[in-house]
């Protein structure tokens, strides 16, 4: 079978095994929108989409010494580009165009992801590992996830933002799930949420969140929040039974109204089957090339070499940079220049007293009996007036 055919969604399985004809399950509006679009009909208007995240900065320009602009300026600049919406993603999927997705966890990474033109940016609970040094994703709280979402939203004005619901924020009941999702949307400023798993309670949670007007991305295969039950970070769908369950789980999430499903660490044929069976996009991570799109963790693909995360750096991740080496070299050079007093030199000591005020300042110090301080100030005046010679600052001692 050709690659292009695998990217064209087709129904391969007997879905009555999951949703029999007599089932009372009705696909929510988001799923219907996707079906209408794929069959050439006119889809309803996109579901509720928060735009508050695009103006989460206080809007005040930062002082000129910091370069001005700040988050508001960045957001305004990025907003000039066409914003990615669910309609954008549906269109790409309908045309068979791959969907690009990557994680981000703070304002700088949000800016980078937005500038690179990604379709989707996931503010993942993997922040627990790559940003906070934990061995898994479980410790991060809902409040902390919201803060990460807010930071990314300030920097990413164009890309479609997805916020993870962290472990412990949606398992107890559908009411808890909806409440957590509403908080992530309203306070975090994202466009949608992602939840893991396909157990009946998770399907109910997904359906309830969609019914509340919030777009939901599903996540099956290796679900990191279930690491204790899975016995570690292990690939899923490697037996016939578990492979079929992956496809059935994807179908169940689609019927619950999810607009896309992440397939993590499953064999490529399993991902291909799920992709072909669905009418919504699949996003692969360690699932081969036959998904509708791909996602990787920001720190993994950039090679930042976070020590805590390096222990579990995934085999499927291609490293596109050695940012960790660049950072280490820059930090080492800075430390060396501080210790050798070659930084800051005159070119990085920009703030001066007006020439007419120098003598008055020195005399004022001497009048207060601060002669040593006056001598130090005079030395500094002479130093900052010097030019750098061959890259080495020349200190002229005040006489």
Swiss-Prot record:
Mg(2+) binds at residues 125, 164, 196. Its EC number is 2.1.2.11. Keywords: Magnesium, Metal-binding, Mitochondrion, Pantothenate biosynthesis, Transferase, Transit peptide. InterPro entries: Pantoate_hydroxy_MeTrfase, Pyrv/PenolPyrv_kinase-like_dom, Pyrv_kinase-like_dom_sf. Binds 1 Mg(2+) ion per subunit. GO terms for cellular component: mitochondrion. The active site is at 264 (proton acceptor). This is 3-methyl-2-oxobutanoate hydroxymethyltransferase 2, mitochondrial. It comes from Oryza sativa subsp. japonica (Rice). The gene is KPHMT2.
């Amino acid at each position: 079978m050709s690659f292009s055919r695998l990217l064209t969604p087709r129904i391969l399985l007997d879905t009555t095994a999951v949703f029999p004809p007599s089932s009372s399950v009705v696909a929510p509006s988001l799923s219907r929108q996707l079906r209408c679009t794929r069959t050439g009909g006119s889809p309803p208007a996109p579901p509720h989409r928060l735009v508050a995240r695009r103006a989460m900065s206080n809007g005040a320009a930062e002082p000129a010494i910091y370069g001005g602009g700040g988050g508001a300026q960045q957001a305004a600049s990025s907003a000039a580009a066409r914003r990615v919406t669910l309609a954008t993603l549906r269109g790409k999927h309908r045309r068979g165009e791959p969907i690009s997705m990557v994680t981000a966890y703070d304002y700088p990474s949000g800016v980078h992801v937005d500038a690179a033109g990604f379709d989707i940016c996931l503010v993942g609970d993997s922040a627990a590992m790559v940003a906070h040094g934990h061995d898994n994703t479980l410790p991060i709280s809902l409040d902390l996830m919201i803060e990460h979402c807010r930071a990314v939203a300030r920097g990413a004005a164009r890309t479609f933002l997805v916020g993870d619901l962290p472990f412990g924020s949606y398992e107890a009941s559908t009411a808890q799930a909806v409440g957590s999702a509403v908080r992530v949307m309203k306070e975090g400023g994202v466009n949608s949420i992602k939840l893991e798993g396909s157990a009946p309670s998770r399907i109910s949670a997904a359906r309830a969140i969609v019914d509340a007007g919030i777009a939901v991305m599903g996540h099956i295969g290796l679900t990191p929040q279930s690491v204790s039950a899975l016995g570690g970070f292990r690939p899923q769908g490697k037996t016939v039974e578990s492979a079929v369950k992956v496809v059935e789980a994807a179908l169940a999430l689609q019927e619950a109204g999810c607009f896309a499903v992440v397939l993590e660490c499953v064999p490529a044929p399993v991902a291909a089957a799920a992709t072909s069976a669905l009418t919504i996009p699949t996003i692969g991570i360690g699932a081969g090339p036959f998904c509708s799109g791909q996602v990787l963790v920001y720190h993994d693909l950039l090679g930042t070499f976070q020590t805590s995360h390096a222990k579990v750096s995934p085999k499927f991740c291609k490293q596109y940079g050695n940012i960790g080496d660049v950072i280490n070299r820059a930090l080492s050079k800075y430390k060396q220049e501080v210790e050798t007093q070659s930084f800051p030199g005159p070119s990085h000591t920009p703030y001066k007293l007006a020439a007419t005020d120098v003598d008055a300042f020195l005399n004022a110090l001497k009048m207060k009996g601060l002669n040593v301080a006056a001598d130090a100030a005079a030395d500094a005046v002479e130093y900052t007036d010097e030019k750098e010679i061959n890259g080495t600052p020349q200190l002229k001692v005040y006489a």
